[in-house]
Amino acid sequence: MLATACLVGGGTAQAATSQPCDIYAAGGTPCVAAHSTTRALYAAYDGPLYQVRRSSDNTTRDIGVLSAGGVVNAATQDSFCANTTCVITIIYDQSGRNNRLTQAPPGYWKGPAPGGYDNLADAKAAPITIGGQKAYGVRVEPGTGYRNNNTNGVATGDQPEGIYAVVDGTHYNQWCCFDYGNAQTDGQADSPAIMETVYFGADKQWGYGAGAGPWIMADLEWGLFSGVNAGYNNIPSINHRFVTAMVKGEPNHWAIRGGNAQSGGLTTYFDGRRPNGYHPMKKEGAILLGIGGDNSVSGRGTFFEGVLTSGYPTAATEDAVQANIAAAGYATAGGDNPQQGVQIVGGQSGRCVDVPNSSTANGTQAQLWDCGSGTNQRFTYTSSKQLQVYGNKCLDAYGQGTANGTQVIIWDCNGQANQQWNVNTNGTITGVQSGLCLDANAAATANGTKLILWSCNGQANQRWTLRS
């Protein structure tokens, strides 16, 4: 079907007295899950939005709102996570049904964390502002994922539902699958029609649209769909900085809508019957974020807020929700391309841990180099104790070596112990497998000094600072 536009105007009075889940409830399709790291999705909500865990002592802190119905109190996170790294451990459900999202377990595909679990998101990696106040999104890099397989009140079978997510329109890739929504409970891709989610990205393996992407599509299992056809449907590529993405479904009827989360209304990209083989639906009612239903972990994206509803929302209800989102005031924080992760700065040299020549080749030995702005010096300390660079490479003890002089290299993240590190309060970084310290070879300080493992000795060439 042809895309149609519906422009709506947002007013601050409505935004002050009613939030998205109040609007859905007034329309007869209440939220059964409401997730956000940026603001309350009910006017009366004054509980926690999410929880973070810091690496320095593994303690946790709930991050709440400045006031009931308001935006996040990001200063709580900034204070708690100062001079260390933090990950997001829980994204709370504001609906009261306890459909919170936590670290995704393994499915058909395994994640890079121990036990096949997925990584948790770096809590500092997606700074923005909302309503003029600082906030953070959930930045999903390949290997990151959240899930709840034991939910309450989420649509199953062919029951109707609506889903929306506000995402970063500039942070995506062409792989599977940056999803948010309803998924299977066992993590296996054993049937079509067992999930229904919003997908945002440029994956063309199944459905796709006009241009190069990204597109708003639906992940229904055994395929991403941009419309009724299994392949191409005439939906546009999206170029907004912040995107409102919506998918909704009821028996043999579904729709895709979307718009600019900073202004204007929604466009209906598809509204029609289910694809062949997808009627009736067999939804199972789990909820996921950042991954495919079978725990496909190759997608990339950033999530700010989203809900699942009971019942098929009307276009008028969705238009009012979009007006509320646009009035919320999503904006960038000091630039459109915030850097992910931290620099690891040598206490003796003042230089940064660096991947030579921005190489991505397995086996490249890490070195010291003057600190710069490149991604080859930005590391994320993950929930599984990996020091991850480029989103998919990890600092690695070569050959699983545990002897003095073992080279410290980069390698595809695989969850093994030689890629796990303890970031200690005394400034050392020690290998979990070896117990040895990350060491600037021969106590050298020059550019190009190679990094190795060495017995911890208290010297300054084994002391490091994590710097945002």
Report the location of each language-model feature.
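Residues that flank catalytic or metal-binding motifs in active/ligand-binding sites
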Residues: D46, V87, K134, Q159-E161, ...
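GGW-centered surface loops in extracellular recognition modules
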Residues: A16-P112, Y164, A327-A333, G341-V342, ...
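Secretory targeting and sorting signals
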Residues: M1-A15
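Short, hydrophobic/proline-enriched secondary-structure or compact coil segments at domain edges
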Residues: A44-D57, Y136-V138, A165, I287-G290, ...
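Extracellular glycan-associated modules
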Residues: S18-C31, A40, S55, C86, ...
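Acidic glycine-/aspartate-rich tracts in secreted/extracellular proteins
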Residues: D57, S95-R97, T170-Y172, E250-N252, ...
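Extracellular glycan-recognition/adhesion modules and their associated mucin-like linkers
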Residues: D336-T360, T375-T402, A417-T445, R463-S468
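Compact disulfide-stabilized, cysteine-rich extracellular microdomains and processed peptide cores
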Residues: L41, G290-G293, A320, N357, ...
